[in-house]
Amino acid sequence: MFTPQLDQIFNIQTLKDSFLEISSKSTGLDEVSYNEFKKDLSKNFEDTKLSILKGTYTPEPLKKIEIDKPNSDEKRPIALSSIKDKLIQKVLYNSLRDYFETTFNDKSYAYRRDKSTIKAINRSTQFIQEKKYWVLKTDIDNFFESINHDKLLMILDKQISDKRIIKLISLFLQTGAFKSFDYFEHIEGVHQGDILSPLLSNIYLDLMDKFLERENISFVRYADDFIVLFENEKDAVTFKPILEEFLQTLDLKLEDEKTKITHVKDGFIFLGVNFVGKNRFVDNERLQKSISKMHNISKTKLGFKGFIDEINSYLSAIKNYYLKIIQPNSTQHLLLKEHLIETISHKVFLTKSAKIIKTKKEFKILLSQINFDILFDTAEINDKYELIISKAYEKYLANKSYKESKTKIDKKKNEYAKKFANDSTLHISKAGLSLGISKNKFVVKEYGKVQKSIPF
């Protein structure tokens, strides 16, 4: 049981600590920014604390927007809270998180301290190595929008002693949102984007986790995406309707299109990883999107030092995810190496073409600041510097040769254009015609539309 009282949770110190942790980027419907709230911070903290303890606090309606889903063409609806509401939710989250962490199942990996996607993937691999070869791969249909408020509050009622805390959480659950000028009531679900929502969603689905544990079932869950593993097909087929029946008690159901029973030798995708037999590799579509992101870094207007920061950040990200899945010197590993060379080479070419950096020596010094050791062996890194510069200079010289040829052609074209102009007599004898000058040319227009242009 969580025993701290509301007045122990909400004090000036917890408000100060939580304020430092909330995002300063977005504003809510009241349009009060982080910096504006900060201008009179002491008073705002005191007013917030008093409104909570007196029970007069009411959250602002949320601002509903849509953002791109990672690695997808789909949109995700999220709701933006005001700075004050985010602050209050952060205090609640910081207070409740540690208690609920002790109650959660260890096979739940999303939104938790010391848990991660990689750990979920490794746990899945462990179960497969234990010869649990039959997999029920599924997720919950429209999960975040389907959480039953009454049932969630009943769960909280059994865990939290001070009912004022539950009442406060209930306010956040019930607060609706505006999308443009339309108001949407919020009678079920948690707001995606709210600070409390990940914790509340885990609290709700922990009931399923405990049910699976009681049934002695192996599973790995990451939010609403999960796999259940069995030693034989019969057990998998038998258990599926049992799971569906249990989920009905939570007003949830499996998403039919994403639910299948398969043998590991036929493969399945979970958390962006393709499991086939005892092997695993990154889903190709996801990898290609990551490679495209890498190439886009070289196409930005960043200077070379800014490019180095961005490419190092990218390399750090793939080290913490992709390289923990992909085998060294596998096809996917070699693909990442190849595209890194192409990306950096293109940036060297653009920088050389812009005459910002002129010598190979300068480029080598800059290249040494890139974390090549994440993808390459130390012994081969110097060779990669040479390869990158060689490719870039080859492209630069080819492009320069093309431009020189184009200049010669343009010069000859202009010679003849001027000759024709000198031999031409311009007659303007029609109503609606006008004569003007534009870009070193006489331009004849008829009612504003260009009819003829002659260089001079």
Question: Across the structure, where does each feature detected by a protein language model lie?
Answer:
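Short, mixed-charge aromatic SLiMs
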Residues: 110-121, 229-233, 338-349
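Short, residue-level hotspots on alpha-helical faces of the histone-fold
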Residues: 86, 90, 94, 98, ...
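Short acidic (Asp/Glu) and glycine-rich catalytic loops that position anionic groups and cofactors
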Residues: 23-30, 71, 100-104, 134, ...
